[in-house]
A protein has these predicted regions:
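N-terminal leader segment of winged-helix/HTH proteins
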Residues: 1-32
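Pre-recognition alpha-helix immediately N-terminal to the DNA-recognition helix
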Residues: 13, 24, 40-43, 102, ...
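Charged, amphipathic alpha-helical coiled-coil/dimerization segments
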Residues: 22, 72-135
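C-terminal regulatory/oligomerization modules of transcriptional regulators
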Residues: 1-4, 124-145
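Short, locally clustered residues in the helix-turn-helix/winged-helix DNA-binding domain
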Residues: 15-18, 43-47, 108, 135
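N-terminal helix-turn-helix DNA-binding core of bacterial DNA-binding proteins
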Residues: 23-66
Length: 145
């Protein structure tokens, strides 16, 4: 069983990893003039254009108001457009513009660079194990939420 000191080191290690990951992610997204969260929204729309704002919020695990503000900035930048659903006027759907679609290749390149930096020096089996452990930790954290 880990003593308190060792548990504290785990917390410190996870914090350092999260900060380094966020910092590198921000740096890479800055190169293509996007914020990390905007890139994540665009990735969701690359997979399923026309999602509702609430679907985006749910998939990104953020508050609806956060997505509304972010989408406003993205709309102002010409990356997305928002339109009322034709069948259910209560819903607002989000669509990629041509400028938003044009970002896909650049975003994927940056995410591949990020992934490469994170997993540099890892074998395929180590990468698979790390993914498994992270997913297990996330599942457990979801149960606690």
């Amino acid at each position: 069983m880990l003593d308190e000191f060792e548990r504290g080191k785990d917390w410190e290690l996870l914090t350092r990893f999260a900060q380094a990951y966020r910092s590198l992610s921000d740096e890479l997204m800055d190169q293509i003039t996007l914020h990390r969260s905007q890139a994540m929204v665009l990735c969701k729309l690359f997979a399923q254009d026309g999602m509702t704002q609430s679907e985006i919020a749910q998939q990104l695990a953020v508050q609806g108001a956060t997505v509304t503000d972010m989408l406003q900035r993205m709309e102002d930048a010409g990356l997305v457009s928002r339109r009322r659903d034709l069948e259910d006027n209560r819903l607002v759907r989000v669509y990629l513009t041509e400028a938003g679609r044009d970002k896909e290749r650049f975003i994927m390149e940056q995410f591949l660079k990020l992934e490469g930096a994170v997993f540099a020096g890892f074998s395929e089996s180590e990468r698979a194990l790390l993914r498994q452990l992270i997913n297990r930790a996330l599942d457990y954290m979801d149960l606690k939420a």
